[in-house]
Regions:
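Short beta-strand segments
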Residues: 35-37, 110, 133-135, 178, ...
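Short beta->alpha connector loops
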Residues: 112-116, 181-182, 281-282, 363-364
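ATP-dependent carboxylate-amine ligase catalytic core
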Residues: 23-27, 54-162, 233
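Residue-level detector of alpha-helix initiation sites
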Residues: 40-44, 113, 233, 386
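Short, acidic/turn-prone active-site loops that include or flank metal/cofactor-
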Residues: 62-65, 135-138, 200-203, 359-366, ...
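A conserved segment at the C-terminal end of the G1
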Residues: 36, 44-61
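ATP-dependent carboxylate-amine ligase
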Residues: 1-18, 29, 54-55, 229, ...
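Acidic, Mg2+-coordinating active-site environments of NTP-dependent enzymes
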Residues: 29-31, 103-105, 123-274, 299-300, ...
Length: 423
């Protein structure tokens, strides 16, 4: 049996082993836990919290799963190379539980709902003081189809909502939700923690350029030195209220905030083009957010480079057809689609809407087309899978900026090479 098949079959059994020892270290640490969950946007929220709370907290960067969070508590890194590392981790966990302890007052932890029972597994252990439920959508939908087939839920959306609800249910003090989400409102109706609905429509003004964003609320302006979607008004209002609750100073100037790779990063490109890099992932909820940002962005010549939406299972065709309307609403000068799903489903829908698109399965052909066509006055906005980060790397004005792109780890480099994409 391969390691991958073993992990899938015995996922939670093995995860319980690491959680057991992590709990020993966790009890010695005894932090105030702030949990961040949702279908998309978790990492951006984490980054904003780090900007405000600083060194008073430990942050679970690159760790959000049933394995990742216990590893993080124990001060261990997960699998980054040889599978033999599992043996070392199994041996190291008991010793780390005795000798390792974080000392920060707060633990800001990202919790994913990638598979059924994962959020539940972590929520019942960590029992956070505060939960921030950022979003709800059909990310990892394919993982929840069995739950629907087995009759546990009517549809995939209901199954995903139920999974995320485990976190608010196990929260002791405060739960922040989107006031516009009927799913979140219904899911948190009877929990014991205080529910704080955040109204994004209280935002007074939103101005976005390829290299900056300003959000205005009342007399306060929140400034970023990169483009951000309008949707993160939710994050801003949450962070401001949370800092007041924690009795910590709130800083509305986010110009020095370090953003995670592939989350609306800004780069200068060859010939002077502007590059907006949102290539980290692609769910319909994040696609909607980024394409809305593109529509509102102050830029003369907008090009969209869109990759496939993955992990959609039986919803794949429907989601990619919906994508066409979102793209058309931007009124882009050019559209480049990369991937079999966008080529099969999105391109024909765009044609019906009167939007021409260049569709290819090969990132190299997309790059070739872009390099031949740009004049230097364009703003290229990237969103989706299919190794768009490789295309961006080849378009950078400064090759050193490549280290700021997503998927720099060895495994990702090897996957790109298997596609013939050198780095």
């Amino acid at each position: 049996m391969s390691v991958a098949k073993f992990k899938k079959r015995f996922y939670f059994a093995v995860a319980k082993y690491f959680r057991h020892f992590a709990n020993i270290a966790f009890k010695k640490w005894h932090p105030r836990v702030i949990a961040v969950t949702g279908s998309a946007g978790k990492t951006t929220m984490m980054t904003m919290l780090e900007h405000e709370i600083g060194k008073k907290a430990h942050y679970s960067h690159d760790a959000n799963s049933a394995f990742g969070v216990p590893f993080d508590v124990l001060g261990l890194k997960g699998i980054r190379g040889s599978k033999i590392r599992w043996i070392w981790l199994l041996i190291a966990a008991p010793f780390k539980s005795i000798f390792h302890r974080h000392k920060e007052e707060f633990y800001v932890v990202e919790i994913d709902g990638e598979r059924p029972h994962e959020t539940e597994f972590l929520a019942e252990w960590l029992r956070p003081e505060i939960t921030i439920w950022v979003s709800i959508g059909l990310s990892h939908a394919v993982q929840f189809e069995k739950e629907v087939e087995n009759g546990k839920f009517k549809n995939v959306k209901e199954a995903i909502v139920a999974e995320f609800t485990n976190l608010p249910v196990n929260t002791s003090k405060r739960v922040y939700i989107d006031a516009d989400s009927k799913y979140m409102i219904e899911a948190t109706a009877n929990i014991t923690a205080e529910v704080i609905p955040i109204k994004k429509d209280e935002l007074k003004k939103y101005v976005v350029y390829p290299d900056s964003t300003d959000f205005t609320y009342g007399d306060t302006t929140f400034h970023f030195n990169h483009p951000e979607p309008k949707d993160i008004a939710f994050n801003l209002f949450v962070v401001r209220d949370l800092m007041k609750y924690l009795k910590l100073k709130f800083n509305p100037d986010f110009s020095d905030m370090k953003i995670a790779p592939g989350r609306s990063s800004y780069f200068k490109g060859k010939k002077g083009i502007n590059i907006v890099d949102s290539s980290y992932n692609a769910h319909m909820i994040s696609m909607t957010s980024v394409l809305d940002m593109a529509k509102r962005m102050h830029a003369e010549r907008k090009w969209l480079v869109i990759g496939d939406i993955v992990d959609q299972g039986s919803l794949e065709e429907e989601e990619h057809r919906k994508l066409a309307k979102l793209i058309a609403a931007v009124k882009p000068e050019k559209v480049i689609l990369v991937g079999k799903r966008t080529k099969k489903y999105t391109a024909p829908e765009l044609k019906k809407l009167g939007v021409s698109a260049v569709a290819t399965l090969d990132p190299r052909k997309a790059l070739e087309y872009i390099e031949k066509s740009i004049t230097g006055k364009e703003t290229l906005i990237f969103k989706g899978s299919q190794y768009l980060e490789w295309i961006i790397e080849k378009l950078l004005a400064d090759p050193k900026d490549a280290k700021k792109l997503c998927r720099r780890e060895k495994a990702a480099v090897m996957r790109r090479k298997s596609w013939g994409l050198d780095s």
